C-alpha cells in the first residue's frame, strides 16, 4: 500500500471517523438549558415559525445550512461509484464550505440513479436547509435535475460541477482578453470536452459576450457540428457549421482553448496554428490537457491557466461556491440566478486587478503579485475573495428581485470581516507560502516513525525538503515497516558524515571558552541534535525541528549553545498559536522564561509581534495581569506596568497596552467602554503572560477543555530557525511545526538577502 494511500485512509479513520460533526451553539449544561433547548421551551419558537415562516431564519440554523446532495454517479475522476462510496467527497465539500465561508453543511447521499428520486428528495428538504449544492451527478441528468429544482423550489440550488468552473474561468477569460487586447465578441473559442462543466462554461461565456457561433465544442468523438447524429439537446446548442472534424483542426486560428476533458490530449504542435497571443485554459485535473511548460515552449506568447496550484492562474472552484452561497444565504435568496453568477465572475475579475496586499504575496512565495499574464484571477487563499464575491452576489440577488432581505453593502462587508477574520487563514496561507520555495529542514530524530510520516507528507506536498539524521539502516527499516518511501528525502548519518570533523572543530571554537574540550566537541557532533544544529549554523540546511523523543529543555539547551539568540536579544521565548473557530490568538511566553522581569517581558512582546506581523496579521498586544491599568498595587502588577512603559517608549507604533486582565483584553465591550484610553484598536490577539506558570497553564487548559487547536511551541528570538516539538507530538503537530519552520526559514533567507 502506497504511503499516500495509507495517509489518506488514516486521515479519515483516526479519532472520530469522517471529517465533520455537529456542534451545539447554545449552552447545554443543566436542567434549565434542557427545558429551553427542548420541551417545553422549544414550543415557543415553533409557534412563532408557524405564524411567520420567515422566523425560521431567526430561531433555527436554516439560514446558514446547506445540503450537499449527490447520488454518486460522477464522483471526481472515479466515475459512478455509488452514493455511499462518494460520501467522503461530500464531507470534504462540507469542510470547504465551513473553512472558507463559515457555512454549515449536511452531506446527503441519495441511493438512487433515477433523477426523479433526486428531485423529490431535494424538494422535501426545503424546510430544513437554506440552500442545496448538487455534487457529482452525471450528465445529462444533472442539467435536468437542476432545472427542475430551480423551477420548483424557493431556496438556492446550485450544481457546482456545472457552474463553478464557468464562473471562475469566466473571470480568467475576461482578464486574459484584457491582457492580450482582444474583444470578447470577436474571439474564437475551442472546447475540449462536452460534459456538464463544458456546456455550462460555454453558456456562461455567451452571457459574458462571446458569440455562440464562435464556439467550437469537441467531445470524445470529435467536433460537434451541425448534422452530426446522436447529439443530445445540450450538445445541439453548440453544433456549428464547420469543416473541422478533429480537435487539432478546430484549433486552427482559435484565440482561446478551454480544456475540460482528459490529460495529454493536446500537443505543442496543435497549438502552432492558433492565433497570436492564444489563451490556453488546460483545466483537466490532476493532469491538464497540456502541461504549462510544454504549452509555453510551443507558444511563448500564450497565456496559460490550469486547475493546479503549482502553476500560475489556478482555476479552482473554491474561489466560487463558498462565497456564492454565503451571499445567497445572507439575503435569503430564492435561487442562484444568472445575475448572481455573473456578479461573482466580475467580482473575481475586478479583484485580480487590485493591488495585492503584501500578506497575500508573502503567502505565495514573496514575489509581488500583479495583474498580468501570470495573475489573471485571485489566489484561493486570498481572504479578500470573501469580501468581494459574497457582497457582489448578495447585491445581485437584491437587484434582481429574488432576495428576501435587503442589505447595506458596507455594513454587510463589515459583518463578513467579523465572521471570518484573516487569522483563520493563517495556517493555510503558511502552507501555500512554504510551497512556493520549499526550504530544507533537518530532523535529528530521523528514525522516529512519526517524524518519518511527517517528512513524507512534507515532501509529497512540496512544503519542505526533509533531511533525516540517524543510522541509515534504522531509518530505512522504520520506513519499510510503515510502508513509506524515502523518495525526495535526504538521509545523513552523523557518525559517518564526511564533514563531522569540520563541524567538531567549529563547535569547539565556539564553545572552548565555555568549558568544552576538543574531544568533547568531537563526541557531541556524533549526536544527531548537535550535528543538525551545526548543519544549520553552516548553512547546510535552512531550519531544524527536533524534540520528538527528548524533553523540551534538553532540546532548547543545545540550540542556545550552538545557534544562540539573534543579535540584540538576550532571551528567546515560546509562542503558541491558539486557533478557535472564529479567531486565532498568540500566547507567549509559554515554554522558556519562568519568571521574566519587565525587560524580558518587553523583549518577549516585541519578538512575538514581529513573528505575528510576518504571518500577515496585525498584532494587538495585551500585557496580562490580575490588575487593570493600576487597579491593584502589587509588585507583580508593577512589573507588567514597567514592561508596558518600556514598549511604549521603544515601539511607539506598536499596538500594545496593559497591564490588563484577560477578559479586558479579549472582550471589546469592556476594553472600549471601561478603558477607552487603551492603545488597542480592537480586542487583543496577542496575549503576553506575566510568567511561565500562567502562560503554560492557560494554553494547556484551552487546548484540552476550550476546543482550541494549539500549534507550537514556536521558538522565537533564535539567530536561525530552530523549532522544538513537545515530546511525543503526533504527526499533524509535527507537520504544523515544520510549516512554521519552513516559513521562518524563508523569512530569514529573505532578510539575509540570500539566494540559496
PLM feature spans:
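N-terminal ligand-binding/catalytic initiation module
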Residues: 1-157, 351, 396, 403, ...
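Glycine-rich adenosine-cofactor-binding loop
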Residues: 65-77, 82, 166-170, 180-206
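Anion-binding alpha/beta catalytic cores of soluble intermediary-metabolism enzymes, centered on
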Residues: 84, 136-183, 404-405, 415-756
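A short, aliphatic-rich alpha-helical micro-motif
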Residues: 126, 184, 250-251, 271-274, ...
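Adenosine-phosphate binding glycine-rich loop
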Residues: 160-161, 180-182, 282-390, 397-400, ...
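NAD(P)-binding Rossmann-fold cofactor-contacting core
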Residues: 192, 208-235
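Rossmann-like adenosine-cofactor binding region
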Residues: 236-303, 309-310
Amino acid at each position: 500500500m502506497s504511503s499516500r494511500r495509507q495517509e489518506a485512509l488514516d486521515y479519515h479513520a483516526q479519532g472520530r471517523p469522517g471529517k465533520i460533526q455537529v456542534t451545539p451553539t447554545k449552552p447545554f449544561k443543566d436542567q434549565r438549558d434542557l427545558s429551553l433547548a427542548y420541551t417545553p421551551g422549544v414550543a415557543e419558537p415553533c409557534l412563532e415559525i408557524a405564524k411567520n415562516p420567515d422566523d425560521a431564519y431567526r430561531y433555527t440554523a436554516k439560514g446558514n445550512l446547506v445540503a450537499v446532495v449527490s447520488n454518486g454517479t460522477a464522483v471526481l475522476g472515479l466515475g459512478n461509484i455509488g452514493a455511499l462510496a462518494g460520501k467522503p467527497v461530500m464531507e470534504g465539500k462540507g469542510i470547504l464550505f465551513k473553512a472558507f465561508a463559515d457555512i454549515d453543511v449536511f452531506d446527503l447521499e441519495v441511493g438512487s440513479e433515477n433523477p426523479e428520486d433526486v428531485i423529490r428528495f431535494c424538494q422535501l428538504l426545503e424546510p430544513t436547509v437554506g440552500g442545496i449544492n448538487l455534487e457529482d451527478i452525471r450528465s445529462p441528468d444533472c442539467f435536468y435535475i437542476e432545472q427542475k429544482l430551480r423551477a420548483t423550489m424557493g431556496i438556492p440550488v446550485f450544481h457546482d460541477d456545472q457552474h463553478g468552473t464557468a464562473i471562475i474561468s469566466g473571470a480568467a477569460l475576461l482578464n486574459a482578453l484584457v491582457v492580450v487586447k482582444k474583444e470578447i465578441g470577436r474571439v474564437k473559442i475551442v472546447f475540449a470536452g462536452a460534459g456538464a462543466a463544458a456546456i455550462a462554461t460555454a453558456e456562461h461565456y455567451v452571457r459574458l459576450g462571446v458569440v455562440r457561433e464562435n464556439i467550437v465544442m469537441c467531445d470524445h468523438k470529435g467536433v460537434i457540428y451541425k448534422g452530426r447524429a446522436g447529439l443530445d439537446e445540450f450538445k445541439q446548442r453548440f453544433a456549428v457549421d464547420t469543416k473541422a472534424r478533429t480537435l487539432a483542426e478546430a484549433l486552427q486560428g482559435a484565440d482561446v482553448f478551454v480544456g475540460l476533458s482528459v490529460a495529454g490530449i493536446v500537443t505543442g504542435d496543435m497549438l502552432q496554428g492558433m492565433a497570436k497571443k492564444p489563451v490556453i485554459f488546460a483545466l483537466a485535473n490532476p493532469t491538464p490537457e497540456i502541461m504549462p511548460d510544454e504549452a509555453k515552449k510551443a507558444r511563448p506568447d500564450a497565456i496559460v491557466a490550469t486547475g493546479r496550484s503549482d502553476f500560475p492562474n489556478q482555476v479552482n472552484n473554491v474561489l466560487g461556491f463558498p462565497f456564492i452561497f454565503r451571499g445567497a444565504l445572507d439575503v435569503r435568496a430564492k435561487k442562484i440566478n444568472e445575475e448572481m453568477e455573473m456578479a461573482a465572475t466580475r467580482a473575481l475579475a475586478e479583484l485580480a486587478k487590485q493591488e495585492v496586499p503584501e500578506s497575500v504575496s508573502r503567502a505565495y512565495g514573496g514575489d509581488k503579485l500583479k495583474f498580468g499574464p501570470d495573475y489573471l484571477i485571485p489566489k484561493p487563499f486570498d481572504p479578500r475573495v470573501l469580501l468581494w464575491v459574497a457582497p457582489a452576489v448578495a447585491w445581485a440577488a437584491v437587484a434582481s428581485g429574488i432576495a428576501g432581505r435587503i442589505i447595506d453593502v458596507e455594513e454587510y462587508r463589515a459583518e463578513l470581516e467579523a465572521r471570518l477574520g484573516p487569522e483563520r487563514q493563517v495556517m493555510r496561507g503558511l502552507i501555500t507560502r512554504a510551497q512556493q520555495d520549499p526550504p530544507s529542514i533537518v530532523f535529528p530524530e530521523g528514525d522516529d516513525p512519526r517524524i518519518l510520516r511527517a517528512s513524507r507528507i512534507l515532501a509529497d506536498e512540496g512544503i519542505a525538503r526533509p533531511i533525516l539524521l540517524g543510522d541509515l539502516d534504522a531509518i530505512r527499516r522504520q520506513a519499510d515497516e510503515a510502508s513509506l518511501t524515502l523518495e525526495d528525502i535526504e538521509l545523513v548519518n552523523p557518525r559517518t558524515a564526511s564533514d563531522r570533523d569540520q563541524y567538531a572543530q567549529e563547535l569547539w571554537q565556539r564553545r572552548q571558552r565555555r568549558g568544552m574540550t576538543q574531544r568533547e566537541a568531537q563526541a557531541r557532533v556524533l549526536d544527531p541534535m548537535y550535528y543538525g544544529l551545526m548543519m544549520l549554523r553552516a548553512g547546510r540546511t535552512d531550519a531544524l525541528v527536533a524534540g520528538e523523543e527528548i524533553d523540551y529543555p534538553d532540546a532548547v539547551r543545545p540550540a542556545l549553545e550552538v545557534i544562540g539568540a539573534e543579535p540584540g536579544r538576550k532571551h528567546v521565548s515560546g509562542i503558541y498559536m491558539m486557533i478557535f473557530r472564529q479567531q486565532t490568538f498568540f500566547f507567549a511566553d509559554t515554554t522558556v522564561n519562568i519568571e521574566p522581569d519587565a525587560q524580558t517581558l518587553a523583549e518577549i512582546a516585541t519578538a512575538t509581534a514581529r513573528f505575528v506581523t510576518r504571518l500577515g496579521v496585525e498584532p494587538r498586544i495585551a500585557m496580562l495581569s490580575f490588575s487593570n491599568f493600576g487597579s491593584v498595587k502589587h509588585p507583580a502588577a508593577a512589573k507588567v506596568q514597567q514592561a508596558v512603559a518600556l514598549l511604549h517608549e521603544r515601539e511607539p507604533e506598536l499596538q500594545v497596552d496593559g497591564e490588563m486582565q484577560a477578559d479586558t483584553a479579549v472582550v471589546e465591550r469592556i476594553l472600549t467602554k471601561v478603558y477607552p484610553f487603551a492603545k488597542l484598536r480592537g480586542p487583543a490577539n496577542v496575549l503576553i503572560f506575566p510568567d511561565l506558570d500562567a502562560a503554560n497553564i492557560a494554553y494547556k487548559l484551552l487546548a484540552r477543555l476550550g476546543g482550541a487547536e494549539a500549534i507550537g511551541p514556536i521558538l522565537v528570538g533564535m539567530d536561525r530557525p530552530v523549532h522544538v516539538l513537545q515530546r511525543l507530538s503526533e504527526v499533524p503537530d509535527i507537520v504544523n511545526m515544520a510549516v512554521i519552520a519552513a516559513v521562518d526559514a524563508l523569512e530569514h533567507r529573505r532578510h539575509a538577502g540570500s539566494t540559496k
